[in-house]
Regions:
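Extended ligand-binding clefts on enzyme/binding-domain cores
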Residues: 20, 24-46, 57-69, 81-180
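Contiguous mid-protein beta-loop-alpha structural module that forms a pocket-lining wall or clamp
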Residues: 51-55
Length: 193
């Protein structure tokens, strides 16, 4: 969905979006998403994290931001799916309600994943980093929740932070060293030193 949006925005070719095979693909994606939606909360479950490693809790903030963005794109380009705009806003609200936690000092941050029973984790993966949320248009780079999130995952005491190293980036268990994808994220987000 995001690739279709980028293609249409870059080329102005919206006719492509209405080819039968593309519309069928969009319908298939929406059907699969519907299977992963929580019955009462507009969050979508995932089994794997961006690295293809198994997740801890079922509702990943980053993945739900992608769902939010994808649903907005569908509503924008497909008149038969304009109702997805309301679902996108429900996802946005659910992320802000359920995926924002507070640290020991009371500062709000985006959790990596949550389970809706109060559990969450502080974590990040360069292939789908929380640092990218402003690039997806989900929040402003000056958003205090975003700023606190970035500060947490780049802090020297975060297990996969390499702050103070020659390449002061983020890793994860999948790649337990400063990952080049993290460097790319930092360049995109203005965090590179």
């Amino acid at each position: 969905l995001l690739a279709l949006e980028r293609y249409a925005d870059a080329t102005g070719d919206t006719a492509f979006l209405h080819r039968p095979e593309v519309e069928e693909g969009v319908a298939e994606i929406l059907g699969r998403l519907a299977e992963k939606r929580h019955p009462a909360v507009a969050l979508y479950e995932t089994f794997l994290q961006p690295t293809d490693d198994e997740r801890v809790y079922p509702y990943l903030t980053y993945d739900n931001v992608l769902v939010w963005r994808g649903l907005r794109a569908v509503a924008r380009f497909y008149s038969a799916h304009t109702g997805q705009a309301a679902e996108a806003e429900a996802v946005r609200a659910a992320i802000r309600t359920h995926c924002v936690k507070t640290d020991a000092d009371g500062a709000p941050y985006f959790a990596w994943s949550v389970d809706l029973q109060g559990h969450s984790d502080v974590y990040d993966e360069p292939p789908g980093s929380l640092q990218l949320l402003p690039l997806w248009g989900f929040c402003d780079a000056e958003d205090p929740v975003y700023q606190n999130t970035v500060r947490q995952i780049r802090a020297p005491d975060y297990a996969y932070s390499f702050a103070g190293s020659p390449i002061a980036e983020i890793g994860c268990p999948h790649a337990p060293w400063p990952w080049v994808l993290s460097l790319c994220n930092s360049l995109l987000c203005g965090h590179a030193e």
